[in-house]
A protein has these predicted regions:
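Short glycine-centered segments of the SAM/dcSAM-binding site in methyltransferase folds
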Residues: 38, 133-134
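A short acidic, Gly/Pro-enriched loop at the edge of an enzyme's catalytic core
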Residues: 93-105
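A short SAM/SAH-binding and catalytic strip from SAM-dependent methyltransferases
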Residues: 104-118, 141
């Protein structure tokens, strides 16, 4: 089995994602979504971003490597009555079965950043997005003193073994030079790439 798939299927990510729904909703509101729009949510989890996209009228396909998260996403979509939203299993590094230029927008919020081959991820995101379409990523920023996640990882690193040789930290997706290099190799000119720093809050005690 793909070790990345095994890792994500082992955890209880749906419980963690419940505290992150606000981030997906706030990001989606900022994108000016107007139907008809076909969107791919890559590394979608159980629908943190895909569900608010579909509620705004977009046709959304969510792809995640973990089958349990795909099942949870389809369950949430059915319960919400969102018949233009589907979830399916897939690998962000190799989107087999997804045709070139299939989507008006490809989005990934705290998802594809965890795939082990970032240059392949960038290439695939560009490949499946229509010319003139948009690619949107939400990624954590390393060494940010205001970031809960950054500080949590810094603390945990002191108590865990070093990563294996060749490991590429997902936090590198929060570094401007890496983003430009990865999408540049996928054919996106530097002047077409822009970055915005923002802060989203975890929901605590339903507040």
């Amino acid at each position: 089995m793909n070790p990345n798939k095994a890792l994500w299927e082992k955890g209880a990510f749906t419980e963690i994602a419940a505290f992150m729904h606000q981030s997906g909703e706030e990001l989606v509101k900022s994108l000016g979504i107007k139907p008809p729009l076909r969107v791919l949510d890559l590394g979608c989890g159980d629908g943190t971003t895909a569900i608010p996209l579909a509620r705004l009228g977009a046709e959304v396909v969510g792809i995640d490597i973990a089958q349990n998260l795909v099942d949870a996403g389809n369950k949430r979509a059915t319960e919400a009555g969102l018949n233009r939203l589907t979830f399916q299993e897939g690998d962000a590094c190799n989107l087999q079965g997804v045709n070139n230029h299939s989507f008006d927008m490809t989005i990934s919020v705290f998802g594809a950043m965890f795939a082990p081959k970032p240059f392949d991820v960038a290439r695939e995101m560009v490949r499946v997005t229509k010319p003139g379409g948009r690619i949107v990523m939400g990624n954590w920023i390393p060494n940010d003193p205001t970031s809960f996640v950054s500080q949590l990882l810094k603390i945990s690193a002191a108590f865990t073994p070093p990563p294996p040789e060749g490991f590429i930290s997902p936090m590198t997706w929060g570094v401007e030079s890496h983003i430009i290099e990865r999408f540049g190799q996928a054919g996106v000119p530097k002047e077409k790439i822009s970055m915005v720093k923002d802060t989203y809050s975890f929901i605590s005690n339903n507040k």
